Amino acid sequence: TVVAVFLISSPWWMQSSDWFTTGFWIFAATGLFHPALSLYFTLESMDRAGATVSSTLAATSPIFAALTAMILLGENMTLLIAIGTLVTMCGVMSLTWIPGTGITKVMRVALLFATAAAVIRGLINTTGKFGLDLMPNAMMAGFLSHTVGGLGVLVIYRLRRGRLPLNMSGAGLRAFGLSGCFIAIAIACMYSALLRNSVTLVSPVIGTYPVFTLLAALALKEEKITLQIAGGVTVVVAGVVLINWV
């Protein structure tokens, strides 16, 4: 669905010159790592340790994005952005972490997979910024990375499950179709933000997505407001305010 949304809208943004740039190949290669490889690592982590640990470690991706941006792109991180990034990460972690969840021997491999997925997500923001400098087309960037990534996900699913997901209900198809539309919009917004701002500024804000997941769940009455949720959302908002404070 994500690729279909980009293709349908392509007459308004696709340019033939983009196909012959170095940035084209950067985003094509990017798709092999995210969403393809990062999804594989996430699934392995969830199978071994569950969604809680996996989601908590996913919140650390902004720090990897900031580090790689400073090393590879020469970006500078102000004190407010550094503090805001750490505050935001702590807030997101507080939303997903269950007290009393310890680290066991069984979970150690899962932690490696989850950390690898977080590193990839962080690095993708840096490579995306570099690619956009060579091919300043946010829509093309999203189209390329998720076309290649979508094919990679199908290959991974086939290897893991032994078959492709061909039998789906109508309700499931509609739900995934709607989800794909939102994901396509989110991807376009992310690359548009990276096109205009630094990785150290954009990445921590992107990392707040679990907050909106919780808010949507609350709106659909699938979650109840608890002290942990209220506190976590407050901390995340405070972190984002610090990051964008001028």
Where are these regions (language model features)?
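Hydrophobic/aromatic residues within transmembrane alpha-helices
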Residues: 45, 71-77, 131, 141, ...
